[in-house]
Curated annotation (Swiss-Prot):
Motif segment (ITIM motif 2): 841-846
Consequence of changing Y828F: Abolishes binding to GRB2
Family listed: Belongs to the immunoglobulin superfamily. SIGLEC (sialic acid binding Ig-like lectin) family.
Annotated motif ITIM motif 3, positions: 861-866
Disordered: annotated segments: 738-772, 790-812
All ranges on the Cytoplasmic side of the membrane: 728-868
Name of this protein: B-cell receptor CD22
One GO CC term on file: early endosome
Subunit field text: Predominantly monomer of isoform CD22-beta. Also found as heterodimer of isoform CD22-beta and a shorter isoform. Interacts with PTPN6/SHP-1, LYN, SYK, PIK3R1/PIK3R2 and PLCG1 upon phosphorylation. Interacts with GRB2, INPP5D and SHC1 upon phosphorylation. May form a complex with INPP5D/SHIP, GRB2 and SHC1.
Signal peptide span: 1-21
Organism expressing this protein natively: Mus musculus (Mouse)
Result for mutant: K242E: In strain: DBA/2J and BXSB
Encoding gene (name): Cd22
């Protein structure tokens, strides 16, 4: 309990000390005095800082004519504004912005700016701004100066204003309030200055509203003239185009003395007198003493008669000479500096002085424009001039300048002039020489060689000219490097070519003049001989008409003859070579030859290519037309065609397409079946040609022959064995025959039929086929069964109906017929048999045992042929 009491005492002591020190810790900044007038507004810029860094305003009051009540220890007075933080939004930064005429523009942190609108005259005096932040409180006095009428602006001027020096005037008003705008305008002698002119440099306006000052300013920067001295400058305050107040000041412009000079008379004849006066018209500050200085052509005058009077000075010139002509001015000084008068020119009249001539340009180039000027001092100026060329008058030219538009060599010479005015004429002082430069004249190139000039000869040329100013210093030749220079102006050309270009020379001083080109006229044999095809326009085909022309580019002399050669042999003479119907045999290399009296020239060979369809086709067989089977054979289709054959087609002896499009047909490996005739067909862009047939014979190899011989021997051995067995069977048959004769009622019979088969005649050899017929290819075994009809008792229905036909009781009631045809031995397809064909054996057997009636049935015959 005691500890808590000690802590409470410490907290109360801290609060008390904070209250006691709060008066020293508040900081409030605002303008010391604010100015306004009845009906305007006042904006009070204000910044504050509470004793506690994070403290915020809880309450703000604005009192008018406030007092402190010592009894209640509170401030009393008219409350113009009272705002307290709201319970709904205690953290808000702004209070209620406006109460009556007062608007709070600050916040709860550091801004206490206020605005009173409209302001009243009775608002003058002190306002009290009461601010509370927690336990901290503060009363800040604010002084207002409100007048019933708008007060005048102030104008700040520099201490001294000088003419032509830039100065700045400042018009200010200790007033600025947003929502009540004012304008500051400048006037010079009641004329508003609205824009930048030659004398007005700038007009700037600014508004300042800070915690230190509140004012509106306008600055006028200009360069005053001396005539602006004493003029009024006015600054006017306006609101909504209404003049509120104004202030006027007078300009005190300091300037140098302003002088006026007069000459009487300004034009005087030689030896007369002249009086000049200089008057001081104005000066600020004024001249202490009149001390006037005189100047002629910018130089001070000395030892002249002067008369000084108040504010005036006189200069008297006696017995005026021409040297006294010129420009005069006077000068006087004050504390600012010297002032000068304008210049006046004194003219002294006299007769022309001796003249001289100036030539422009000199020396002159031929063709240039030349101007000659006659220089003769005179006053008044000379009105008439007489020009002389080589001391002879030039009629028609009476001006000061003599102009020659295009000078030529004959214009060269000495020139002089004579000037004249109303006081008399002058004299000729000295002559001027006109020197006209021109390039060499009449330049020519001369050939100093024998003519005619032949190709390969040497030629000498000389460059000559008529006149030149200045003299010729060098020569040039065109084309450059065409020869060697023997000496200046002489050129030697070694081995002149047939196409030598024309040669010209130039003689040069500071300019070059070229001679006309001289043609060497070199004689030479015909050049660039060539063969031209006149017709046809496109490719040449057999049967067309062809016309060739012999052409050449150059020939000197021009008379020529033409000759034609084919493959080096002379064909005919003439410019044209014609083929009525060209053939392949006309193909070859053609040259045309052109000759003149100098020599002959042969053209390059021109190849005449005649296009024609394939011809002379034939089939060549490699390695030969008789080839053993198993090897390979290559058939080539040889032809004559232009252009070459692009597609080949091969056919066999039967005319069948072998589907080979190449020039060569390869057969590998060869078989006997490849034997036959072959032909080829070739096609190019012109047409198609076909070869006659060529025969290829393929014979058996020894291996094949051996195999077939062995097969034949085996077959013969088989026949012999069968023959032996046949004899045995025959013998057996003869034995059984006697027994069969005893059986009369027997219907069975057995017999052999021998049938000799005629051998097919071998085919004759031909180019398409070789060999003979081979019976072994037709080996057959024939077999037949003859069934006997059944007895009549069983023939109750259709014999062909399977339902009523009963099978025979046994297989003995049948007839068997067979043919055995033996395979021939040693028979080959392409070898004739060495012995006749063995005959075939036919065997049949008819057997029927038992007695009784035959069953009546439809006789059936089954016949079977077996081939192997």
């Amino acid at each position: 309990m005691r500890v808590h009491y000690l802590w409470l005492l410490l907290i109360l002591g801290h609060v008390a000390s904070a209250r006691y020190s709060s008066a020293n810790d508040w900081t409030v900044d605002h303008p010391q005095t604010l100015f306004a007038w009845e009906g305007a507004c006042i904006r009070i810029p204000c910044k504050y800082k509470t004793p506690l860094p994070k403290a915020r305003l809880d309450n703000i009051l604005l009192f008018q004519n406030y007092e402190f009540d010592k009894a209640t220890k509170k401030f009393t007075g008219t409350v113009l504004y009272n705002a307290t933080k709201t319970e709904k939004d205690p953290e808000s930064e702004l209070y209620l912005s406006k109460q009556g005429r007062v608007t709070f523009l600050g916040n709860r942190i550091d801004n206490c700016t206020l605005k009173i609108h409209p302001i009243r005259a009775n608002d003058s005096g002190n306002l009290g701004l009461r601010m509370t932040a927690g336990t901290e409180r503060w009363m800040e006095p604010i002084h207002l100066n409100v007048s019933e009428k708008p007060f005048q602006p102030y104008i700040q001027m520099p201490s001294e204003i000088r003419e032509s020096q830039s100065v700045t005037l400042t018009c200010g008003l200790n007033f600025s309030c947003f929502g009540y705008d004012i304008l500051l305008k400048w006037f010079l002698e009641d004329s508003e200055i609205t824009s930048i002119t030659s004398s007005v440099t700038s007009i700037t306006s600014s508004v300042t509203s800070s915690i230190k000052n509140v004012y509106t300013e306008s600055k006028l920067t200009f360069q005053p003239k001396w005539t602006d001295h004493g003029k009024s400058v006015k600054c006017q305050v306006q609101h909504s185009s209404k003049v509120l107040s104004e202030r006027t000041v007078r300009l005190d412009v300091k300037y140098t003395p302003k002088l006026e000079i007069k000459v009487n008379p300004t034009e005087v004849e030689k030896n007369n007198s002249v009086t000049m006066t200089c008057r001081v018209n104005s000066s600020n500050p004024k001249l202490r003493t009149v001390a006037v200085s005189w100047f002629k052509d910018g130089r001070p005058l000395e030892d002249q008669e002067l008369e000084q009077e108040q504010q005036m000075s006189k200069l008297i010139l006696h017995s005026v000479t021409k040297d006294m002509r010129g420009k005069y001015r006077c000068q006087a000084s004050n504390d600012i500096g010297p002032g000068e008068s304008e210049e006046v020119e004194l003219t002294v009249h006299y007769a022309p002085e001796p003249s001289r001539v100036h030539i422009y340009p000199s020396p002159a180039e031929e063709g240039q424009s030349v101007e000659l000027i006659c220089e003769s001092l005179a006053s008044p100026s000379a009105t008439n001039y007489t020009w002389y060329h080589n001391r002879k008058p030039i009629p028609g030219d009476t001006q000061e300048k003599l102009r020659i538009p295009k000078v030529s060599p004959w214009h060269a010479g000495n020139y002089s002039c004579l000037a004249e005015n109303r006081l008399g004429h002058g004299k000729i002082d000295q002559e001027a020489k006109l020197d006209v430069h021109y390039a060499p004249k009449a330049v020519t190139t001369v050939i100093q060689s024998f003519t005619p000039i032949l190709e390969g000869d040497s030629v000498t040329l000389v460059c000559r000219y008529n006149s030149s100013n200045p003299d010729v210093t060098s020569y040039r030749w065109n084309p450059q490097g065409s020869g060697s220079v023997l000496k200046p102006g002489v050129l030697r050309i070694q081995k002149v070519t047939w196409d030598s270009m024309p040669v010209s020379c130039a003689a040069c001083n500071h300019k070059c003049s070229w001679a006309l080109p001289v043609i060497l006229n070199v004689h030479y044999a015909p050049r660039d001989v060539k063969v031209l095809k006149v017709s046809p326009a496109s490719e040449i085909r057999a049967g067309q008409r062809v016309l060739l022309q012999c052409d050449f580019a150059e020939s000197n002399p021009a008379e020529v003859r033409f000759f034609w050669k084919k493959n080096g042999s002379l064909v005919q003479e003439g410019r044209y070579l014609s083929f009525g119907s060209v053939s392949p045999e006309d193909s070859g290399n053609y040259n045309c030859m052109v000759n003149n009296s100098i020599g002959e020239t042969l053209s390059q060979a021109w190849n005449l290519q005649v296009l024609y369809a394939p011809r002379r086709l034939r089939v060549s067989i490699s390695p030969g037309d008789h080839v053993m089977e198993g090897k390979k054979a290559t058939l080539s289709c040889e032809s004559d065609a232009n252009p070459p054959i692009s597609q080949y087609t091969w056919f066999d002896s039967s005319g069948q397409d072998l589907h080979s499009s190449g020039q060569k047909l390869r057969l590998e490996p060869l078989e006997v079946q490849h034997t036959g005739s072959y032909r080829c067909k070739g096609t190019n862009g012109i047409g198609t040609g076909e070869s006659p047939p060529s025969t290829l014979t393929v014979y058996y190899s020894p291996e094949t022959i051996g195999k077939r011989v062995a097969l034949g021997l085996g077959f013969c051995l088989t026949i012999c064995i069968l023959a032996i067995w046949g004899m045995k069977i025959q013998k057996k048959w003869k034995q059984n025959r006697s027994q069969q004769g005893l059986q009369e009622n027997s219907s069975g019979q057995s017999f052999f039929v021998r049938n000799k088969k005629a051998r097919r005649t071998p085919l004759s050899e031909g180019p398409q086929s070789q060999g003979c017929y081979n019976p072994a290819m037709d080996d057959t075994v024939s077999y037949a069964i003859l069934r006997f009809p059944e007895s009549d008792t069983h023939n109750t229905g259709d014999a062909g109906t399977p339902a009523t036909q009963a099978p025979p009781p046994n297989n003995s009631d049948s007839v068997t017929y067979s043919v055995i045809q033996k395979r021939p031995m040693g028979d080959y397809e392409n070898v004739n048999p060495s012995c006749p064909e063995d005959e075939s054996i036919h065997y049949s057997e008819l057997v029927q045992f038992g007695a009784g009636k035959r069953p009546q049935a439809k006789e059936d015959v089954d016949y079977v042929t077996l081939k192997h």
